[in-house]
């Protein structure tokens, strides 16, 4: 999978390494894959990680599926999913009371199974809600966005009501 974006005009000066580590919060393991495979391109060319990115630069990140093997999940029922929001990276659904977020046993069916069937590919639990709790729950639609979302959620404080 490839991701491309353009450095905006209002972007602060930083290196490729700082861009991936501090701005996009890409974890060390994923940065390692990107660096060793030379899968970070700036304006179509590989670049030294200490090189600065410039306003208007085209950044391309290439992720190999082999680095992120998909888990096999039993199929769920997509009609049980109430979608609240979805984009290319995440899906947010309403978890009903009485349904587990994820299974404890390999053959058990839970919300994760239903969401994965709804999306058409394996999704990943970003956070969970207790079985008896209903509410919005976030799933990552690919394995390389999951640790980024986890790092963002770690920085957020919240209060149980």
State where each predicted segment sits.
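RNA pseudouridine synthases
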Residues: 1-161
């Amino acid at each position: 999978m490839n991701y491309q974006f353009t450095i905006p005009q209002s972007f602060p000066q930083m290196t490729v390494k700082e861009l991936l580590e501090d701005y996009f919060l890409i974890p060390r393991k994923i940065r390692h894959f990107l660096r060793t495979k030379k899968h970070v391109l700036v304006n179509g060319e590989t670049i030294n990680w200490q090189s600065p990115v410039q306003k208007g630069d085209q950044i391309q990140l290439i992720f190999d599926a082999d680095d992120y093997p998909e888990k096999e999940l039993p199929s769920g029922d997509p009609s049980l999913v109430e979608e609240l929001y979805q984009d290319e990276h995440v899906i947010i659904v309403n978890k009903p009371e009485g349904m587990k977020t994820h299974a404890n046993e390999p053959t058990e069916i839970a919300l994760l199974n239903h969401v994965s069937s709804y999306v058409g590919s394996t999704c990943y639990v970003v956070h969970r809600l207790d079985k008896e709790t209903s509410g919005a729950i976030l799933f990552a639609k690919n394995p390389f966005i999951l640790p980024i979302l986890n790092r963002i959620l770690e920085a957020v404080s919240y209060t149980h009501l």
